[in-house]
């Protein structure tokens, strides 16, 4: 591997600096309503999601359970995500309905999270954890597929970076807020408020047609190239 020479990547109008590369990616994001809305919504959505994650150990503890059950909780969610990813890979979502399905799944995830805090048996909570994992796994495949279909290869890494920054930017703040709310009120109230924020935020994706239309919009600055392929 050390002896293999580096093959330079040839790009048209290659950006000369990191600042220019990020500016180019941001310029592309602003031309795509579905992408801009998705990044903006997840900036807010992850505030509620992170606050909920802080409350999970208290849910387990309040039921008189311990670390083993907390581990089972995490394992069931991860298993659900694997199932969801597999199902979405076997039966891809058609592009024309991809955005609608995406935002419906987000709402489903939020409601499943609210059920975790309800006074129900732990086994029933695990059912909702499994469903949340399946929906989340499917959601991830839809978003990654759309990014692959709609973003040119030379922009994909930078756009993915902006997407990740948008998702993570409020996460350092959200656990602090979640812990404070749980301490001040209780787990159920915190979960209810977090889910309300998550659902209200993503409602825009269902209401505004351009947000749920997961299709590349051609512009003079970013024309659609014939070589770019679309997934089913």
What is each of the regions a protein language model found here?
Residues 1-10, 204-208:
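C-terminal membrane-cytosol helix-exit motif in multi-pass small-molecule transporters
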Residues 4-5, 34-37, 49, 67-68, ...:
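A short alpha-helix capping/helix-coil boundary motif
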Residues 6-39, 223-232:
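Juxtamembrane intracellular "pre-TM" segments in multi-pass secondary transporters
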Residues 8, 35, 53, 212-213:
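Charged, solvent-exposed alpha-helical segments that act as regulatory interaction surfaces
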Residues 23, 30, 44, 56-57, ...:
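C-terminal transmembrane bundle of multi-pass solute transporters/carriers
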Residues 42-48:
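Mobile cap/lid helix-loop segments that border enzyme active or cofactor-binding sites
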Residues 48-54:
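Extracytoplasmic gate region of multi-pass secondary transporters
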């Amino acid at each position: 591997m050390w002896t293999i020479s580096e093959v330079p990547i040839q790009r048209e109008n290659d950006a000369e600096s990191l600042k220019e590369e990020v500016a180019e990616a941001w310029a592309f994001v602003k031309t795509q309503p579905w992408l801009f809305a998705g990044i903006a919504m997840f900036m807010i959505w992850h505030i509620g999601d992170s606050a909920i994650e802080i409350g999970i150990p208290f849910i387990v503890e309040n039921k008189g359970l311990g670390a083993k059950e907390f581990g089972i909780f995490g394992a069931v969610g991860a298993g659900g995500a694997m199932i969801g990813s597999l199902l979405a890979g076997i039966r891809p979502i058609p592009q024309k309905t991809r955005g609608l399905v995406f935002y419906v799944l987000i709402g489903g995830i939020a409601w499943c999270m609210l059920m975790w805090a309800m006074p129900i048996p732990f086994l029933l909570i695990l059912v909702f954890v499994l469903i949340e994992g399946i929906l989340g796994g499917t959601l991830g495949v839809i978003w990654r597929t759309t990014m692959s279909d709609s973003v040119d290869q030379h922009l994909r890494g930078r756009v993915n970076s902006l997407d990740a920054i948008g998702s993570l930017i409020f996460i350092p703040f959200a656990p602090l807020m979640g812990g404070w709310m749980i301490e001040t009120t209780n787990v159920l109230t915190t979960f209810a408020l977090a889910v309300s924020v998550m659902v209200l935020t993503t409602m825009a994706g269902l209401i505004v047609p351009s947000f749920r239309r997961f299709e590349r919009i051609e512009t003079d600055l970013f024309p659609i190239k014939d070589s770019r392929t679309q997934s089913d």
